[in-house]
């Protein structure tokens, strides 16, 4: 029997022809995929955007921050948009327009919907997707407010336990990392001048920060012994890493392919393991509910669900809410710790003044107390200036239009559009910050003396010129916990260690990716206990 192809006279195709034809077809599909419509009538910023979006979209995969800076410089009194691989992103610069949209209800302009798209919650964390029914975010906000009230009460043992957990976690992670570095050939690579005999140790900064912040965050969320469980802690830290990574992978594929691609990604498996652990923990707590007082965020959330039976939330809803909180809390806090340590190590001229303030506040309010931390205005200022100088996200106030929205000046935002306001360019704007390109560690400490600016100079303060934690009703409710975590880390390292960048080198360069600016995750610092130095002098 003849094969079907034998009935037709196909020309013989060489390999080069097949490759060229295939590449052409893929290229056409790719360009059509990028040829999404421009729905909003504002200027488009990017290379070659007058003719096609694809070149600017590809460049913005890594360098969107430059496009946002360019748009702000040209159209800072109105708005602009930039192309990405999947959509146009609209940036509202005018302050009056920003105020108009930032507090519009979520049924109209939704923060949760844009986060669902940004981090692909439909596939990676389906229980928190925009379409899913979730425990209200206000519950977590109330829980964090309750914990903050406890921290501010001298009679409540919470903050003392919080500080003790930091100390234990820091010491354990330092020992683990030093042992690993001493046994690794990487610690003895060519060019290193490290001298362990005199107390110096090379420590990778981001892994140290991530584990210590993870330990503190899980203590606040789940208490002991779960925060001290190495397997659980590693899983939490891993989850905070795989969600943004896997989301980037998924967003690069058309929607039809995502159900297949997600099957080979890590985030759903890690999420499933975390959910199983937390459901077991929740059931265990319910069995001993009568004998254990409410002590952490999980207890608070369980109590809220129990008080609202008509809401029909179950243990799985609680577990998924807590998993989402883990994701939201870990990486941004850890990165701020890393940036601050890098700035301190490369700017030793600040150390004496900071240490003098730390000693004075401990003497006045007691070592390790919340009152002492809250009175360290120079420490707070240095961290806030670090945040200003190294802003994680070039954008803020993200919203997805679920309905058409029209500003008072007539600009229409059609349904399905994504809007932001520029964030990082504001920190370079001389209208808001004097000498913005100069790092001034005590900039915000001096601002406290200004009656008009004093309320906005604290690390946790939010306004239109400082949107690291958002602003308005979607401002991050966990920012007070973040402030305490970062301050504990900075104070402990300053007070107890000599430290510098590896090989006495310059500050490790930041790593831009799209709208984000990340610290060098692999960079090491050298640490030496101060008592070891004194012994060797």
Swiss-Prot record:
Phenotype when inactivated?
Answer: Accumulates the paspalane 13-desoxypaxilline.
Pathway the protein takes part in: Secondary metabolite biosynthesis
Q: Which SUPFAM superfamilies match?
A: Cytochrome P450 (SSF48264)
Signal peptide span: none
Protein keywords: Glycoprotein, Heme, Iron, Membrane, Metal-binding, Monooxygenase, Oxidoreductase, Transmembrane, Transmembrane helix
What does the UniProt induction comment state? Expression is down-regulated when the stress-activated mitogen-activated protein kinase (sakA) is deleted.
- Listed GO molecular functions? heme binding; iron ion binding; monooxygenase activity; oxidoreductase activity, acting on paired donors, with incorporation or reduction of molecular oxygen
> EC number(s) for this protein?
1.-.-.-
Which topology term describes how it sits in the membrane? Single-pass membrane protein
Keyword Signal, does the record have it?
A: no
* Gene Ontology cellular component annotations, sorted alphabetically: membrane
A GO biological process this protein is involved in? secondary metabolic process
Which portions of this protein are annotated as coiled-coil regions?
none
Give its localization. Answer: Membrane
Q: Which residues are glycosylated?
A: 182, 188, 310
Q: What is the enzyme's main class?
A: oxidoreductase
Keyword Acyltransferase in the entry? The reply is: no
Query: Of which family is this protein a member?
Result: Belongs to the cytochrome P450 family.
Protein task: Cytochrome P450 monooxygenase; part of the gene clusters that mediates the biosynthesis of lolitrems, indole-diterpene mycotoxins that are potent tremorgens in mammals, and are synthesized by clavicipitaceous fungal endophytes in association with their grass hosts. The geranylgeranyl diphosphate (GGPP) synthase ltmG is proposed to catalyze the first step in lolitrem biosynthesis. LtmG catalyzes a series of iterative condensations of isopentenyl diphosphate (IPP) with dimethylallyl diphosphate (DMAPP), geranyl diphosphate (GPP), and farnesyl diphosphate (FPP), to form GGPP.
PANTHER family documented for this protein: CYTOCHROME P450 (PTHR46206), P450, PUTATIVE (EUROFUNG)-RELATED (PTHR46206:SF4)
Q: What is this protein called?
A: Cytochrome P450 monooxygenase ltmQ
From the broadest rank down, the organism's phylogenetic lineage runs:
Eukaryota, Fungi, Dikarya, Ascomycota, Pezizomycotina
User: What is the gene name?
Assistant: ltmQ
């Amino acid at each position: 029997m003849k094969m079907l192809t034998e009935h037709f006279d196909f020309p013989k195709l060489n390999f080069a022809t097949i490759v060229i034809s295939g590449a052409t077809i893929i290229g056409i599909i790719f360009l059509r995929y990028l040829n999404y419509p421009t729905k909003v009538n504002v200027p488009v910023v990017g290379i070659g955007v007058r003719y096609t979006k694809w070149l600017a979209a590809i460049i913005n995969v890594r360098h969107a921050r430059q496009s946002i800076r360019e748009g702000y410089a040209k159209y800072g009194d109105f708005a602009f948009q930039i192309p990405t691989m999947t959509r146009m992103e609209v940036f509202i610069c005018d302050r009056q327009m920003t105020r108009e949209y930032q507090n519009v209800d979520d049924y109209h302009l939704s923060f949760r919907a844009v986060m669902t798209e940004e981090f692909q919650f439909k596939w990676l964390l389906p229980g928190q997707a925009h379409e899913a029914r979730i425990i209200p975010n206000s519950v977590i906000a109330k829980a964090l407010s309750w914990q903050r009230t406890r921290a501010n009460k001298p009679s409540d043992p919470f903050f003392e336990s919080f500080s003790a957990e930091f100390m234990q976690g820091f010491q354990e992670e330092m020992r683990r990392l030093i042992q690993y570095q001493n046994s690794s050939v990487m610690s003895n690579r060519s060019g290193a001048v490290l001298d362990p005999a005199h107390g110096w140790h090379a420590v990778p900064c981001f892994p140290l920060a991530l584990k210590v912040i993870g330990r503190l965050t899980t203590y606040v969320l789940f208490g002991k012994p779960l925060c001290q469980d190495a397997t659980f802690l590693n899983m939490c830290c891993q989850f905070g890493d795989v969600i943004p990574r896997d989301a980037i992978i998924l967003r690069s594929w058309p929607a039809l392919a995502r159900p297949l691609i997600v099957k080979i990604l890590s985030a759903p498996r890690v999420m499933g393991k975390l959910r199983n652990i937390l459901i077991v923990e929740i059931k265990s707590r319910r069995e001993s509910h009568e004998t254990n007082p409410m002590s952490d965020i999980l207890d608070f959330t369980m109590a809220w669900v129990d008080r609202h039976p008509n809401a029909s939330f179950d243990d799985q809803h609680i577990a998924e809410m807590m998993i989402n909180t883990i994701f939201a809390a870990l990486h941004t806090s850890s990165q701020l710790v890393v940036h601050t340590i890098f700035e301190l190590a490369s700017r030793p001229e600040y150390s004496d003044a900071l240490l003098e303030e730390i000693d004075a506040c401990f003497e006045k309010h007691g070592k390790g107390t919340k009152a002492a931390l809250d009175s360290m205005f120079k420490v707070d200022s240095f961290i806030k200036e670090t945040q200003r100088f190294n802003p994680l996200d070039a954008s803020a106030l993200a919203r997805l239009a679920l309905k058409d929205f029209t500003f008072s000046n007539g600009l229409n935002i059609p349904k399905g559009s994504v809007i932001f306001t520029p964030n990082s360019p504001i920190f370079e704007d001389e209208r808001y910050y004097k000498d913005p390109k100069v790092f001034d560690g005590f900039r915000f400490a001096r601002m406290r003396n200004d009656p008009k600016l004093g309320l906005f100079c604290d690390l946790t303060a939010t306004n239109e010129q400082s949107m690291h934690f958002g602003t308005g009703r979607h401002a991050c409710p966990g920012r007070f916990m973040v402030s305490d975590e970062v301050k504990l880390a900075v104070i402990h390292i300053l007070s107890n260690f000599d430290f510098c960048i590896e090989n006495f080198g310059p500050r490790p360069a930041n790593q831009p990716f799209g709208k984000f600016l990340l610290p060098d995750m692999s960079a090491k610092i050298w640490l030496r206990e101060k008592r070891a130095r004194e012994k060797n002098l």
